[in-house]
Amino acid sequence: MSRHMPIAALAAIVLLAARPGLAADAKQMEDNKKAVAAFYDAVLNQKDFDAAAKYLGSRYTQHNPGAADGPEGLKGFIAFLKDKFPNNRSEIKRIFADGDYVIVHVHAVREPGTRGNAIIDIFKLENGKIVEHWDVVQPIPEKPANTNGMF
C-alpha cells in the first residue's frame, strides 16, 4: 500500500463532506439570480413597484449617486420611468452570481429606435432579498472604435 493512500482517502472524505454545502450554495445563487431577474423585470419593464417590493429586504441601500436611497427612492424612480420613458425596455444579456452578489449585463433602451445603454448592475442579497444596488451606465456610441459590440 502506498504511503500516499491515507492522504488521498482523507482528501476524498473532506471533499465529499463539503459537497452538500456546495450544492446548497449553488441553489441559493440560482435562487438569487431568479430573484434579481424578476425584480429587474418588475422595475424596468413592468414599472410596477408592488411587484418589485416583494424582492426587497428590510433595507435597500442605493449606491448610484443620482438615485434616492431606500424603497421610497425606488418607488420614485419607477414613477419617473412611467412618466418620462413609458416604453423603456431592459434586456438582461448575462447574469452572474457570486455568493450573495448578483451581477447583470443589460441592454436598456429608453426610447424605441435608439441605441440605448449598456448597463452593469450589481445587487447584494441577504436571505434571498435585495438589500443593496450599484450600477454603471455606458451609452452605446453611434460609431464605436471597434466592431466587437457591447453585448
Residue ranges and their predicted role:
Residues 1-8:
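Bacterial N-terminal signal peptides that target proteins for export
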Residues 9-11, 21:
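Cleavable N-terminal signal peptides
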Residues 12-16:
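Hydrophobic alpha-helical segments of integral membrane proteins
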Residues 19-151:
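C-terminal and inter-domain tail/linker signature
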